[in-house]
Amino acid sequence: MTRHISVEWPDPTPFRNRDGAPIRILAVSDQLDPTLIDQRNRAGIGPIDFIVGCGDLSREDLGFIADAINAPIVYIRGNHDTNERWRHTDCCPEASESAAVHRMAGVSLAGLAWPGLGGPHATRSERKAWGQALRLATRRLGRSGPVIMFSHVPPFGAGDLPDGEYHRGFRGYRWLLERLQPPLWLHGHTPLADVTDWQSRCGETTVVNVTGAVVVDLWPPNSVPPTRS
């Protein structure tokens, strides 16, 4: 069953002319949620404004999801998105450049791909993660309004496995989280079986592990209904 979370969005501007409806995001990563395969199950999700991919899904899977949901998609690459798995295909648009900023349904998003792509193997690099974070920070991101952050690897100490090197979050991302305080940070990479909860709170930021799929409803200030899981 696809998980669901409601998040308050501090800027009322994107909700004008929506007649009280939330902005609905389908966030996916790492493995294809079986719910998305069956048309009847997809119908139960309801309309989606846009899709966010947080890495380690093939472009074929991403293209299928975007076509089946009938919504625009923005996504970044994970550590497994290399070689034949990442061959060019016409079924899906190109991945977002790391540290690129997008605008979807009136909401700003910034993505952070796995910071070690470019060769036959995706190596883990704290130095490159810091480089990503600093590039976004120098753009004065967040000064003109709130932003959704989406990455493959979570920030250090927020949805990660800090005792294991491979699934430990990046300290540069944690610095960026504390600097920007985005309302929402979406990520994958961390196996759901290894964590006690798929969502956490870091200051003003809701951090969500979207492995599989999560529907995120963004609500204007002071209008979030009770959250269902």
Language-model regions: role of each:
Residues 27-30, 50-56, 74-79, 148-152, ...:
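Active-site neighborhood of phospho(di)ester-bond hydrolases with catalytic His/Asp-centered motifs
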